[in-house]
Structures are given as C-alpha cells and as structure tokens.
C-alpha cells in the first residue's frame, strides 16, 4: 500500500469504501476499493484472491481495468483505473424534460455490449450490472466496473452501510431462485439499463424481491412453462402468482424507435435460452446507423 496515497473518499461500493488515490511514483490517479469481507477475522479467502487475480487479465477498452491487488492488515484493496463519473450520476444530471441524445444512447449500449461480449467470451459473468457500475469519461467512452467481483465475494443482501443492494436490474431467473444461471443474466440487466438510458427512469423499480418480480410480470406477463420451459419448477416460483397478460414495452419506454424496441424486447425475453446473446445483439439493425468511428473502437 505504500505505493499509493489516498486523496479522498469518493463513494461506498457494494463491498466497502472507495477512495480516489495517487501512485506515489508515477502520479497516476486510481480508484482504490477497500473490500470488507463478512468474516474479518479469517482474512481474505484464497478462492477470492485467485478469482481476483484472473480479473487482471481482462483488458478491453470498455472494461475498467484492475491494475493491482494489495493486502494491508488482512484488508484487500483493489486498485482500478479512475473515472470520475458513473452513469447514474450522469442520468441524474440531465435536466427535467430533457433526455440523453439518441445517438449517445446507441453508442453507450454498443460499448456496454462490447464489454460484456469480451467478458462472456472469457467465461466471466458480471451478475450485478447497474448504472452505478457503468463509468463514463468525457470522451464518450463507457466502461463496465466491478466485473467478476460477485463470483469472488458473493453479492451481499445489504451493503455494509445497510443500504439494500438494488434488485432493479436483476434477471427473473435469479429472482426466482434458479441455481443454474449463465451469461443471459447480464443481458437482462443491460436490457433494463438500455430502457433507462432512453427514459432516465428505472424500468422495473421494485422494493423487494416479490415487488420486483410482479413489476416485471405486469409489464411482460406472468411467465409459465409455455413461454419459459421449467420456470414453474424454479425454487421461488409460486402457482399463486397473479396471472398478468403481456403488455406492450412501447408504453413503458417512450423514447426508442422501432429497432430499439425490437432489440430491447429480445434482451428481455423470459427464457434465458431464447434471450439474445451479446454477440447477436451487436449485429441487430438498431446499430446499423451507428457512427462507424464508434464501431472501430
């Protein structure tokens, strides 16, 4: 740790305090995440350290790079590249009645998908994507942060500050207690974020797991084995769920054109096996008119 100087606290992450820091020798500005683990006395599990070490290999223009992993007093510090703004703060800063430019929505979604495809191709899931861990710079680049941390440390129910970890971006298979899930969980999250890029409002903002599920069901219909084979045998599926009929996504997401709504609907398919992959999403006609400059990035 002697290589880094803490400058100021910049936030509370899922796992602990995040500081802005500077490397003593190079002067490089970094984000320092202090990981607080449930079982402080046992120190950091070796499995977590192994997982985290693998993440240093994830190098991509749309992934926040993990530069260093340090231990101090049995505390783990993760040193990341520093970006000053996250997507939630940016969305909150757009004045009432105004929206993000549609070409920027498209560019951000394209970059998010490129980042996710890169990680998925290396068998790394995110599992906890949300606007707070999408970081942006002033050049129009967006990067995914906190990749792979869920697998290394688990996702706590509450942040150590007792703030509840958001459920708004969580896929229905996770909410219904599926033991086996894979890359489609991230695509669902990106779909909900896509809608929020367009409208500035979370698409499904539940305040409990059941409220979250019911908000999804009201919009997309209550799933059954017909639309999603085996869903009725998932751990938390109840036959007593109200049977809502599918509504129209267009009524919830006003600022997307036909192609945008089509892509969104493919990302929000109930059956994870039929949900569009990141790779296929990048080929969707919605991106046909994306500035070529961005595609080359």
UniProtKB/Swiss-Prot annotation:
Its EC number is 2.7.11.22, 2.7.11.23. The keyword Cell cycle applies. It holds the Pfam family Pkinase. Induction: Follow a cyclic expression; during interphase, accumulates gradually following G1, S to reach a critical threshold at the end of G2, which promotes self-activation and triggers onset of mitosis. Induced transiently by TGFB1 at an early phase of TGFB1-mediated apoptosis. ATP binds at residues 10-18, 33. Phosphorylation at Thr-161 by CAK/CDK7 activates kinase activity. Phosphorylation at Thr-14 and Tyr-15 by PKMYT1 prevents nuclear translocation. Phosphorylation at Tyr-15 by WEE1 and WEE2 inhibits the protein kinase activity and acts as a negative regulator of entry into mitosis (G2 to M transition). Phosphorylation by PKMYT1 and WEE1 takes place during mitosis to keep CDK1-cyclin-B complexes inactive until the end of G2. By the end of G2, PKMYT1 and WEE1 are inactivated, but CDC25A and CDC25B are activated. Polyubiquitinated upon genotoxic stress. One of its GO terms (molecular function) is cyclin binding. GO terms for cellular component: centrosome; cyclin A2-CDK1 complex; cyclin B1-CDK1 complex; midbody; mitochondrial matrix; mitotic spindle; nucleoplasm; nucleus. Plays a key role in the control of the eukaryotic cell cycle by modulating the centrosome cycle as well as mitotic onset; promotes G2-M transition via association with multiple interphase cyclins. This is Cyclin-dependent kinase 1. The lineage of its organism: Eukaryota, Metazoa, Chordata, Craniata, Vertebrata. The gene is Cdk1.
């Amino acid at each position: 740790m002697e290589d880094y100087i803490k400058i100021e606290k910049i936030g509370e992450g899922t796992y602990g305090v995040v500081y802005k820091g500077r490397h003593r020798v190079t002067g490089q500005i970094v984000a320092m995440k202090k990981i607080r683990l449930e079982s402080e006395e046992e120190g950091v599990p070796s499995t977590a350290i192994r997982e985290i070490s693998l993440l240093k290999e994830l190098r991509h223009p749309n992934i926040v790079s993990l530069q260093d992993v340090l231990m101090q007093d049995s505390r783990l510090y993760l040193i990341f590249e520093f970006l000053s703004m996250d997507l939630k703060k940016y969305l909150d800063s757009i004045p009432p009645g105004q929206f993000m430019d549609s070409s920027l929505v498209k560019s951000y979604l394209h970059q998010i998908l490129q980042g996710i495809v890169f990680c998925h191709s290396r068998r790394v899931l995110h599992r906890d994507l949300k606007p707070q861990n999408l970081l942006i710079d002033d050049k129009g680049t967006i990067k995914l942060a906190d990749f792979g941390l869920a697998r290394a440390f688990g996702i706590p129910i509450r942040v150590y500050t007792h703030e509840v970890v958001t459920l708004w971006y969580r896929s229905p298979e996770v909410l219904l207690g599926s033991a086996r899930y894979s890359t489609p969980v991230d695509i669902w999250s990106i779909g909900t974020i896509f809608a929020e890029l367009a409208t500035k409002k979370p698409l499904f903002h539940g305040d409990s797991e059941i409220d979250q599920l019911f908000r999804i069901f009201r919009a997309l219909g209550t799933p059954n084995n017909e639309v999603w084979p085996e869903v009725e045998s998932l751990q938390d599926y109840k036959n007593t769920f109200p049977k809502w009929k599918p509504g129209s996504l267009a009524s919830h997401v006003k600022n997307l054109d036909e192609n945008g709504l089509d892509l969104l609907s493919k990302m929000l398919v109930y059956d994870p096996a039929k949900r569009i992959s990141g790779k296929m999403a990048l080929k969707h006609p919605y991106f046909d008119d994306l500035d070529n400059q961005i595609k080359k990035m």
